[in-house]
């Protein structure tokens, strides 16, 4: 089912080429008497003209003086991209490029004649065509229109066929039509950062994928294009037979089936847009993952753009913040420190430590966000109240060697290996280096002084949700070539914690949502998670009023079907994650429970099991 959509999306190109070739050959047959002598002359000077053309003008001017490379023949379709259910997300659609060799025209009368015909047949402005033909009379190649519809192109071909029956050579026969693909994203802004864009290589007509899936899978999606005859000849290119216009047959690109669910992507983008408006945030990211496999179900970013018209967008907005924007995560990172403390055995879930309200680590005194002490507290209370002092004690009990080993285990400070272009490493300090001090051991424990990407944070928490396996996150579910499907197998990168520790921490994080992050809860479901509010570092220090807020969690807690990360930048309505990112998480989770038809826990597990779990 999913392979059929890409095939349908690509069928237009070969058909268009075939129709043009058929029409061209019929014209050739009807002009057999004059073509022979023209071709004899053309073959005689062909080699010389190719050399001259490449030496004098590797880049030819056209239109308003814009450079363009000599055209290549028969660019074949790039592979299509569909979601996990076969919904088309990216494909090539075909237009005709209209070009000519200006010195075929004898005078202004012929130039005006063809200009008027092109306007009537294809809507190409006659005045612009006439001016181009007069301005560049000696060009080897001149593009008159970058793209016209297939229907308009067929009208020109039909008229050329009719004019071939008339005596002499009508100037319209000097017009060449070349099927030209353009990348089309039918869902427009949906998944724009994830998909990436298509761009033209400078001073060429060759297309290249940039960012996202298009960039990462460039070599896979790209086809081997036909290598065409790029020189001036003594006859119109459209009238040359195939063996003269010789080019290597194009090989179609391969198709990709994504792990993305278009409907889940839409939910994430809709809730992200709502959150930005409601909380007056400047930007944001929502990631939805399947923790057992590492499949990315949705990856939404805002502000976003339309990949069909990305030139109008801010260039900085084209990169995917989910993999390329690193930030200090704040207290959401306490999940990682807690997991490391439990797995290393330096604390137990019920063990209590004393919170005096401050602790000196190295040259720095660490305080709680509320500037208060809370006495004897266990891990659940420490996470629910988000106590910096207790978290720093956990890291001190582990020591710097063990603490940073766990950070590395969870995948921080290195790429996750997700199959998207532009992923960055994040930033973690290491003991023994010049930029590390003992105070970093304390501040890093609660997510300050290090930088992560949203995908790193989501994937690390997913490893707790799945029982301790760090998976390679991925967005391509399968590759399709000639009807054969190559499925991506989930990859385990390593172990973060033991399964029993993951289960213990999950129970703690459920209580954290119930006791400290109630805004993230959804009635009837046990959700594990935690919020984080991070001040934004500047040259002068940390800001007081500008924050980045995050909530990451998973559900249902006993058998997680999805992990959701919500990140909002500089919310103005409230600087706290509990009032912004947490309720946004709940909105996404609520809609996913409905979409995946996941019953409430008391129905799914039974009332007795719900009470015990």
Residue spans of the language-model regions?
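Periplasmic/cell-envelope proteins involved in peptidoglycan metabolism and beta-lactam response
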Residues: 1-310, 401-411, 521-522, 537-542, ...
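Beta-lactam-recognizing serine transpeptidase/beta-lactamase-like catalytic domain environment
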Residues: 16-19, 90, 233-247, 260, ...
């Amino acid at each position: 089912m999913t392979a059929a959509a890409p095939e349908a999306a690509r069928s237009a190109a070969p058909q268009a080429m075939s129709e043009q070739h058929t029409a061209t050959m019929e014209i050739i047959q009807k002009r057999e008497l004059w073509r022979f002598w023209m071709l004899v002359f053309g073959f005689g000077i062909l080699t010389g003209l190719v050399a001259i053309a490449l030496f004098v003008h590797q880049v030819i001017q056209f239109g308003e003086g814009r450079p363009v490379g000599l055209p290549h023949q028969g660019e074949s379709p790039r592979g299509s991209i569909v979601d996990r259910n076969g919904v088309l997300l990216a494909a090539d659609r075909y237009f005709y490029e209209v070009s000519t060799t200006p010195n075929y025209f004898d005078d202004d009368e012929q130039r005006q004649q063809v200009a008027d015909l092109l306007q009537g047949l294809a809507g190409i402005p006659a005045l612009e065509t006439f001016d181009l033909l007069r301005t560049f009379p000696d060009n080897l190649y001149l593009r008159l229109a970058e793209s016209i519809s297939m229907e308009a192109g067929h009208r020109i071909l039909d008229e050329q066929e009719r004019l071939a029956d008339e005596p002499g050579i009508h100037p319209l026969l000097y017009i060449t039509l070349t099927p030209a693909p353009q990348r089309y994203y039918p869902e427009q802004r949906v998944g724009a950062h994830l998909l990436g864009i298509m761009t033209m290589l400078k001073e060429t007509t060759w297309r290249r994928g940039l960012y996202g899936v298009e960039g990462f899978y460039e070599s896979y999606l790209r086809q081997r294009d036909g290598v065409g005859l790029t020189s001036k000849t003594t006859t119109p290119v459209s009238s040359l037979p195939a063996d003269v216009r010789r080019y290597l047959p194009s090989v179609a690109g391969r198709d990709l089936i994504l792990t993305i669910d278009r409907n889940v992507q839409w939910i994430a983008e809709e809730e992200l847009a709502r959150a930005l408006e409601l909380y007056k945030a400047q930007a944001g990211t929502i990631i939805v993952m399947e923790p057992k496999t590492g499949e990315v179900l949705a990856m939404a970013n805002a502000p976003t753009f339309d990949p069909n018209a990305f030139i109008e967008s801010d260039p900085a907005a084209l990169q995917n913040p989910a993999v390329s924007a690193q930030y200090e995560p704040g207290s959401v990172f306490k999940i990682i420190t807690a997991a490391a403390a439990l797995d290393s055995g330096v604390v137990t879930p019920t063990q209590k430590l004393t919170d005096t309200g401050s602790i000196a680590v190295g040259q720095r005194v660490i305080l709680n966000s509320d500037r208060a002490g809370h006495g004897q507290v266990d891990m659940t209370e420490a996470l629910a109240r988000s106590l910096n002092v207790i978290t720093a004690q956990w890291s001190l009990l582990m020591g710097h060697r063990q603490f940073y080993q766990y950070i590395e285990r969870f995948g921080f400070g290195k790429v996750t290996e997700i199959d998207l272009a532009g992923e960055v490493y994040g930033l973690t300090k290491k003991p023994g280096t010049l930029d590390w001090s003992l105070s970093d051991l304390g501040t890093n424990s609660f997510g300050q002084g290090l930088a992560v990407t949203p995908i790193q944070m989501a994937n690390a928490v997913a490893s707790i949700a799945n029982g301790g396996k760090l998976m390679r996150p991925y967005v391509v579910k399968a590759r399709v070539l000639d009807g054969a499907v190559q499925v991506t197998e989930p990859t385990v990168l390593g172990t973060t914690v033991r399964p029993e520790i993951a289960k213990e921490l999950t129970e703690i994080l459920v209580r954290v949502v119930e006791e400290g992050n109630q805004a993230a809860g959804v009635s009837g479901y046990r959700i594990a998670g935690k919020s984080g509010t991070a001040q934004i570092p500047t040259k002068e220090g940390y800001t007081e009023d500008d924050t980045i807020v995050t909530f990451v969690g998973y559900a249902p807690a006993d058998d997680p079907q999805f992990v959701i990360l919500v990140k909002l930048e500089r919310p103005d309505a409230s600087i706290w994650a509990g009032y912004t990112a947490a309720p946004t998480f709940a909105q996404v989770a609520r809609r996913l429970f409905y979409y995946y038809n996941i019953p409430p826990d008391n129905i799914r597990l039974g009332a007795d099991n719900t009470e015990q779990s």
